[in-house]
Amino acid sequence: MSFDPDWLALRAPADAAARAPEPLARLEEWAAGRRLRVVDLGCGTGATHRALAGRLPGARWTLVDSDPDLLALAAETGAEIRRLDLARDAEDAVAEADLVTASALFDLASGDWIARLAAALPPHAALYAALTYDGRETWRPAHPAEPAALAAFHAHQRGPKGLGDGPALGPGATAALAAALADRRLLVAPSPWRLTAADRPLIEALAEGCAEAVSETGALDPETLAEWRDARRAAATAEIGHLDLLALPA
């Protein structure tokens, strides 16, 4: 499980704009006066650190990923970096954390992996999981094949992604994470991307990536798939649903 740095850079402005303000404010309030040990899982190039570092003064960050190339870029934040196989060793990564963070990660995880991570989270620690895909998408104008294509994309999302045994939870990940952390104080808020013509490169990249995933399912014939892809590439607006979850100690 790894991502192209160019894709991460392309989505970064949309991610930054989408983060839900209430979980961030609650996290900042809880963290005030604490010198936190923060572990960011699946850190990529360090986007979560860049989003939160100013809100968590004095925190000691460890950025964790399995991809050495992404970690080399994440090191530019000045935080400690750690290369780790998250599929196998996530429990080790969070064992001494006061705060665990992740962005756009949990929809790639299996139910087993989420349960393991939740069980390993120290009782005193908090977890902030942002930008988890929730399956809701609105493209304008919409192509007639949109419902069938989106259903096929969701099926692809629920295939194995390498983060735990079995299929990824895809749009169901936040619900599973909330259930696994039900003994904590939870706040869940929507954090959708709201894309316009100004976001054309991201819209086009999404259209291409989703079309590739749908093609692997065989749900659409090639002609319909191409027409749907092109309609998405030319969309005037797109809203892509995500959820941000904050879990604070009970």
Residue ranges of model-derived segments:
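A conserved beta-strand element that flanks and buttresses the S-adenosyl-L-methionine
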Residues: 101
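Conserved catalytic/acceptor-binding region of the Class I
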Residues: 124-190
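Conserved class I S-adenosyl-L-methionine
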Residues: 35-44
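A short, conserved alpha-helix within the catalytic core of class I
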Residues: 108-121
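Short amphipathic alpha-helix with an adjacent loop that forms part of the alpha/beta core around
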Residues: 89-96
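Class I SAM-dependent methyltransferase Rossmann-like catalytic core
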Residues: 1-31
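C-terminal helical/coil "lid" or tail adjacent to the Rossmann-like core of SAM-dependent
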Residues: 189-235
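Class I SAM-dependent methyltransferase SAM/SAH-binding core
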Residues: 46-89
